[in-house]
Design a protein with these regions (language model features):
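Short nucleic-acid-contacting surface segments enriched for D/E, G, S/T with interspersed K/R
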Residues: 81, 178-195
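Structured beta-strand/turn binding interfaces of compact recognition modules in eukaryotic regulators
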Residues: 89-96, 163-165, 173-177, 195-197, ...
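A short, polar/proline- and glycine-enriched secondary-structure boundary/capping micro-motif
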Residues: 93, 110-112, 181-185, 217-220
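OB-fold/S1-family single-stranded nucleic acid-binding modules
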Residues: 102-108, 199-234
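Fungal eukaryote-biased detector of long internal structured cores
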Residues: 166, 180, 186-188, 201, ...
Length: 244
């Protein structure tokens, strides 16, 4: 079998957005002889997960990339189901189970290099992940940039802003908990597959483990900007409510 059809079939088998023939041809021809198929799959996967779905720069096959149906996305539309699989990317994620004031206090503590454990204030360990342990007197820039609110437990509910290939944006809410969604787990620019049958109610996508498949990935510039501006955005929302 020709290498390009093999590569395309392998990428589609793991639910990635359909790559363009031009992208695959360039990738295969970049070295002579071509790299082994597993290496090509890994490279193509990384590129596809890091691209902007709404401006894919010829990486994706637009003819095989359906958008969210406009009728279902209307705020006054009643419940509907997606008739086909749709790839989207994450623009925002928020834990609705934690108040915005609590999120602000946690982020301000992280900015000071602190985090609370029970009643004890401790220093954030260098390079610690959001749900990782903390240690005294040792913090790092990654902790300050990425550490966020509370651990996403089994009862947490998250709201996301999703974008399709045409740039349409829509809110999505966990109807049932999805382990791979959460602050510190979900990256900005991450790709997700909304499977056919996904319910959309009043313009909001309802996410369940059966219909939402997180694929991973990240658009670095988007994620950095989101993380750095998150504290101010929370303050703006809270401040706006109190000035009305």
């Amino acid at each position: 079998m020709d290498l390009i059809p093999q590569l395309r079939a392998s990428l589609l088998a793991i639910s990635l957005p359909a790559p363009s023939t031009a992208f695959l041809t360039t990738l295969v021809a970049s070295r002579s002889p071509p790299p082994p198929l597993p290496s090509l799959i890994a490279t193509a996967k990384a590129r596809l997960l890091a691209c902007d779905l709404a401006a894919p720069a010829a990486l994706l096959d637009a003819a095989m990339l359906p958008a969210l149906p406009a009728a279902a996305m209307a705020a006054d539309a009643s419940s509907a189901r997606l008739s086909r699989d749709v790839h989207v990317q994450v623009l925002d994620v928020e834990n609705l189970s934690v108040s915005r004031w609590d999120q602000i206090e946690e982020l301000e503590a992280v900015a000071r290099g602190e985090r609370t454990r029970g009643r004890q204030v401790v220093r954030v360990a260098a390079g610690a992940d959001d749900d990782a342990a903390v240690a005294p007197d040792n913090d790092g820039p990654r902790s300050r940039r990425d550490a966020v609110a509370a651990v996403a437990g089994p009862s947490a509910t998250h709201r996301l802003v999703l974008q399709d290939c045409r740039g349409n944006r829509v809110y999505a809410v966990e109807l049932r908990r999805i382990d791979r969604i959460g602050i510190g787990k979900t990256n900005i620019g991450e790709k997700m597959l909304l499977r056919a049958g996904t319910v959309v109610a009043r313009g909001t996508v309802l996410l369940t483990p059966e219909t939402c498949l997180p694929l991973g990935g990240r658009i670095e510039a988007w994620h950095e900007a989101w993380a750095e501006s998150r504290l101010q955005r929370l303050k703006d929302v809270v401040g706006g409510r109190h000035t009305r």
